[in-house]
Amino acid sequence: MSQLEQRLGPNLRLEWKLLNQEKASSLEFLRLCDKMIKVGEFLLAHDVAKAGLRKHKKDRKLSQKAAHALSKAGSPMMATKILEELVAGGDRDVETHSLLASAYKDLWEYSSDKESKIKYAELAIARYEEAYATNSFDSLRTSQRQDLETQYYPCINIAFMHFMSGDLDKGRESAEKARQICKKLKDKGTYDYWIQVTEAEALLLLGSFDEAAFTYRSATKREESQPSQIASTRKQALQIASVYEDEDILAKVLLAFPKLGIVACSGHVIDGPGNARRFPPEAESEVKRKIEEALE
């Protein structure tokens, strides 16, 4: 399925409108949230999570989704408040700590003064390390795949934050651990988009520029890759490349990613309700096909 078909396929707003909020299970709210986050409907995803929490007040995963959606929508400070409450309540889940760390990373990025940058970088690293420490790399040599799948994300972000904060040695040490985790997962038959771009980022941090660019390029061509995922990956890759202060490295990383465009649509209703039909309904599917062809 193409990225365009994935984006246009579900009518998420209609699905949300039709959801029976009084009878819906927490799982139904979560599934809808996931769909919306996947295609970049972050504010709508937050609305769904909030509605779900009104009915399922203690649901940890719905709280996680609400915070995740807020972060993605550009409100990381509000997200930290939700997640810090979960942690204060005894939540030691890897996902909670990873999301909290990610929100602090966003605050680090948005901060303009040095003091705030240092503060949020330290908070982000501490939370990523908390997530990673639930099953440290040293104890994962004989670990099952499920454990490994929770570790590559905090590990690569520890590497990223150290590297961007100027501690290149610590950054590369964690990058090598992340690369090894990805290798283990690949050997076990698990190698999705996020694992592949994590491997690419580790290679970039370690200075293997050609291999990193090749791995990024391969990941963006995967059938399941989403434009929002590629944009996020590209942004972080360019941040790392800029640290090297070498235009050739930056150019190499830029060329590894496709150019993502923005489509703006405008128009008016051809045939108003109750008026005689002027546009033949049988032509609608052909027009849709032509538009999709042009966008692809």
Task: Name each model-derived stretch.
Residues 1-35, 55-72, 91-112, 136-138, ...:
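Amphipathic alpha-helical repeat scaffolds of TPR domains
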Residues 2-13, 34-47, 68-84, 116-129, ...:
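Helix-turn-helix repeat elements of alpha-solenoid scaffolds
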Residues 16-20, 46, 50-54, 80, ...:
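A conserved position within tetratricopeptide repeats
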Residues 39-52, 60-83, 125-129, 147-161, ...:
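Internal alpha-helical scaffold/solenoid segments in large eukaryotic proteins
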Residues 41, 246, 251, 257-293:
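Eukaryotic intrinsically disordered, low-complexity segments enriched for acidic and Ser/Thr/Pro residues
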Residues 73-79, 107-114, 160-173, 201, ...:
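Alpha-helical linker/edge segments of TPR/alpha-solenoid repeat scaffolds
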Residues 163, 176-180, 209-227, 255-258:
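TPR/TPR-like (Sel1-like) alpha-helical repeat modules
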Residues 174-180, 184-198, 202-205:
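Structured C-terminal portions of repeat-based eukaryotic scaffold domains
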